[in-house]
Each structure stands twice: as structure tokens, then as C-alpha cells.
Amino acid sequence: MSTRVETLEFQAEARQLLQLMVHSIYSNKDIFLRELISNASDALDKLRIASLVKDGPRVDSADLRIEIEADVNARTLTVRDNGIGMSRDEVVGLIGTIAKSGTAELLRKLRESEDGAASSDLIGQFGVGFYSTFMVADKVTLLTGKAGESGGTRWESDGAGTYVIETVDDAPRGTAVTVHLKPEDSEDRLYDYTDENKIREIVKRYSDFIAWPIRLVSAPAAKDRDSNDDGTAESGAGAENAGDRPLNSMKALWARPQSEVDKAEYDQFYQHLSHDWTGPLEVIHMKGEGTFEYEALLFIPSRAPLDLFTRDARRGVQLYVKRVFIMDDCAELLPNYLRFVRGVVDTHDLSLNISREILQQDRRIQLVRRRLVKKILASIRALQENDAERYRTLWKEFGAALKEGLLEDADNQDAILGLVSVDSTHDADRPTTLREYIERMKDAQNEIYYLTGDSRGMIENSPHMEAFRAKGYEVLILTDPVDEVWVERVAEFDGKPLKSIAKGEVDLDTDDEKKSSEAEREQLRKDFAALLPWLAAKLEDDVKEVRLSSRLTTSPACLVGDTFDMTPALEKMYRAMGHEMPRPKRILELNPTHALVMGLRAAHERDADSAALGDTAELLYGMALLAEGGELRDPARFTRLLAERLAEAL
């Protein structure tokens, strides 16, 4: 085989990340070994799965392992696996570049964070853990051979911005990463990573639950290599090391009784599984028995991942069959709105070579999914009832995702509605549930009032709020983008209809108030009988009706929709998604007691044909549109008319 040697540059983002690692100020440098072991474990998982496919590589799972070789004299540490390996192109693609969304966000947060736990969390979340080796290395060498291919690839870099890659004739199947260690420096927390006790400590802390045996081998023994059945060389320990006890326990934590697992073990397993080095907010350990048996160990994180709302974000949990790993991110086991849940599901009755296509149709998987969802929602409900602080944390981090379930999961809609926690005008510092809102409703109130918008400040200052504030009615303040959608889909909660205060007619007066003000109302209808149709004609391109308002107390006008109209914010959202949305005509409501509206009526009575009067009508509509956060059709014209009217008033 011809040897091809190239010196290539890292992608720009990779160079920046390398510089952060090479000149690292992060306190927890031990994580480099955790990341190398995690990568090795992934490679072994992929090889075992590939072996299940027809014409896949022949593999004896009992021989699959991870080795750690420490050479004290050479000051090197090698992490070796006999997994799937990589081709030359894969090495360039996976190590020479960072082909991931959110890279800029990762770099920014790493620069901001000097805390070891925080930085290791970010490194793990973004899947760029290989680069962490440069926190402890002067140079890193990688040798890899792809399963089923002859030859291999050697990669080497000192982290200065370039790397050397070459094709080699002889490479065992799998990957070996050799870290040429920097000198010890206790002040910089650079420890002796060739020390056996230090290696054992790191493996026990971070990688105890790795499913493959991790063995520590001496440098001379590691040079003795076995051979595969097919004759290709395979990395492995020498005979004198074959019986060594693994450094990790490899315990299937989910298979043990819940009473026998302590919090520290749950935390360690969660950290291994998720690369989130804070503890989980909630642990859900369950077992299903009967016609279809399974165990599940699920975790609700303490904080949302950075990519929770990105299209290519991780979702789903790990699937095992009889303790054998099948796949990561099994989306078929949990709905999308629970994508933040991490964990493991181990079934007893599925085939080891089950495919995603079969999973989608398998009734047993659908049964497990239903049970998992109900258990997760019940656990969140228990937090809501018994631990308000942790529940508020959960809702702050994942509430927006959970509310997506109101659109996706009709079977559990009522359960999710019971969990919904939103801001309201009742208490600016404490969100409320719908159940709590109902308990505070006024005696004559039959509807749950809400208003959607971009922010709490915008909603609180909306003209639509004026009458509700004046009469002491509580209004839900909904600011998540998903709120615009689910309130349209959900008709009621606990028999109480949900009512947007920006739609339809609003009448908050009691029967006695209506009787006492009936004469006044009738007089106002007569006074404005000429102005209202005139305004409707002037603004016919934008409004379908002009009427007197019962919801305004201080603003001159506002725009409202009919009961089943789409909100302006929802229209804007659909347009941003590329949908063609016509601009529906709205209803313009006037405050008959406002000085501007009263002046407009008087001016109309004096000269209904005045051009200036028509301009004022246009300005009035524009003001109402801006007050609800809408967009003017012609901002330049609006500004010019406003300037002219202001000049006339001076």
C-alpha cells in the first residue's frame, strides 16, 4: 500500500477550540480520560451493532474491550479499543473539523467559564471531547483501522493549528489514542496521568458504568497483540493481562432493585450517560412486568441543554435488549416534547437485530412508550404537589418543551394541562397553574382569561388589559412562542373555557352595572352613529368593523379579532416559517371617553370631508397596531403624517 502523508489545517472553529484547550485554565483536566473512554465505548457499541447486520464484521463480543496503557518512562498514556475504527476520511471529518451546530455558542461559553465542572459539561454536551486531550498533552497521536478494511490511518498534532495524517499499511482494528503528556504542574492541576492510582480514580469516578471492560495494561504487555479469526491484527492485552480485573464495575444499574441503589450511584450513571456533570433533577426508576417485561432508568436533568430547541438536537433514550446495547437516542420510546429526558430502557423480549423501521411499528415498543410517558408525567405531577422549588426549576428549564405536548399528545393533554405553570397578573414573582387560577376566579367569572405576546412588559402595557386591570380580573400572561399555538388548540380546562382578551366582545360589567349604565351606552351609540361607519370606510383596507369598546379605560383605541381569528403574533410566526399568510382585517375598537376620540367625533361633525381628518383616522389605526406589537404597512407614511399633525398642534 502506498503511503500518503499530508499536513492539513484545522477548521477555523476547531483551531479556536484547540487554543482554548492548549492554554487551558480549566481546573478539571481529568475529563480528557473520561472523554477518550467514552469515545472508545461508542466505537465498541458501533462494532457490535455492525456485526448483527448480514455480511457485517465477525465479532466475538467477549473479546471487545478498552485498554489504558501508561508508560512512565515515555510519559505517554494510550487509550485503546478494538472497536469499529475509522477510515482516513472519517478521521479528517471527525477530528479536523467541528461539523456541529452551536459551535460559536460553545466557544463563547467556554471562554466565559473558568469553572472546571462547567467547562467539562460543555465539552461533553457538544461532543468535542477529543480536543480536551490538549489540556494535558504536548502532542496527540492517533492510530486507527476501520473494521473490514486493510491498512489504517495515523494522525498526529501538537494542537498548534495543523495536523499530519498518513495512510499506513499495518493498523489493528480499532483506535488507539496516545497522549504525550505535559510535565506535571500541581498549581495548574496537571497531575501524573501515568500513575496507576490516578487512572483508577478517574475511571471509577467517571466511567464505572461503561458497558465494556476497561483494563489497565503495562507498556511491555500491551505490545503483545492477539490476532482476529480472520487473520487481521487486533489490539489487546498480552496473555499475562487477560485475567486482570476490569477497572470498572459494568453494573446494569437499572436492573438492580431501587432500594439497593443510592443517590451517588444514580448521579454517577446519569453523568456518564448525559455528560452533564451536575446531578439530575429527578430520577425515575421503574420496572414493567407481565406480557412484556422491561426495566427503565430515566433522568430529568437539572438544566436544559443548549440545543433543546434545535432541529438536530439529541432526543430519545438508550435502548438495550437483555443488557445488550442496541442504539442511542431511540426516539420511538419517548415523544418529542419529552426529548430532554435521558436514560436507559432495557427490554427482555425484542430481537437483538431490531431496526428503527420495525421499532416504529412494534406494538410492544408503543406499549412501553405509553407507560414511560405516563410515569414521567406522574413524576412531574408529584414534584408539583410535593416539592414546589424543584418543580419550578423543572418548568423554567423544560416548560416550553412540555407545552408542545398539548399539540402532539391528545391522550395526555389533560395531564399536561394540569402541569402547566405560567405567569399571570396575580403575582409578578410566582407563576400559577390553571387549577390555582380557577380557585381565584371571581364568583361571576366563567372563563380563563389570557393574553399572548412577546414579553411580560408588552402584555402588561397592552390596551386590552385596561378593563381587566380596572375591575381586578386575573389574566394569564403567555410569552412562549408555543403558547400562541396551544391556546388555540385547547378549548377548556376543568370545564372553564380559555378566552383571549384580545378577541371577540368583552363585557365585564355585572347585571346591576349594565342596568345603571344602559342609558349612557345608548347615548354613546347615538353620538357615534355617524363616526363609526365613516371610519370603517376610511380604513376599509385594514379593518372590517369599527365599534365602541368596553375593554378600554385609558387608551384611545385597540385592535381585536373575532373569536376564531388567528393572533397577529401567530401570523408573524407562520410567515417566519415561510408560509404565505394573508393579512386578515381586524376590528378597531374606540374608547368613547378618550379625549382624542371625542375630538375626532367633534371634528367629523364639523367637516367630515377634511383631508386632515382622514389622516388622523389613519394615525389612530397605526397607534392601535403599534400598541399590540404589530408592524405598520408603510412606516414612512405613518411617520410623515405624525410629524405633520404634531407641527400643526404647536
Curated annotation (Swiss-Prot):
Function description: Molecular chaperone. Has ATPase activity.
Gene (name only): htpG
Region (Disordered): 222-245
A as annotated region, ranges: 1-356
Pfam families in the record: HATPase_c_3, HSP90
Domain of life of the source: Bacteria
Subunit structure: Homodimer.
Disulfide links within the chain: none
Organism name: Frankia casuarinae (strain DSM 45818 / CECT 9043 / HFP020203 / CcI3)
Family matches, as InterPro entries: HATPase_C_sf (IPR036890), Heat_shock_protein_90_CS (IPR019805), HSP90_C (IPR037196), Hsp90_fam (IPR001404), Hsp90_N (IPR020575), Ribosomal_Su5_D2-typ_SF (IPR020568)
Descriptive protein name: Chaperone protein HtpG
Residue ranges, annotated region (C): 573-650
Entry GO CC: cytoplasm
Keyword Oxidoreductase: no
Region described as B: spans on this chain: 357-572
Listed HAMAP family: HSP90 (MF_00505)
GO molecular function, one term: ATP binding
Localization annotation: Cytoplasm
Key words, A-Z: ATP-binding, Chaperone, Cytoplasm, Nucleotide-binding, Stress response
Major localization listed first in the record, in broad terms: cytoplasm
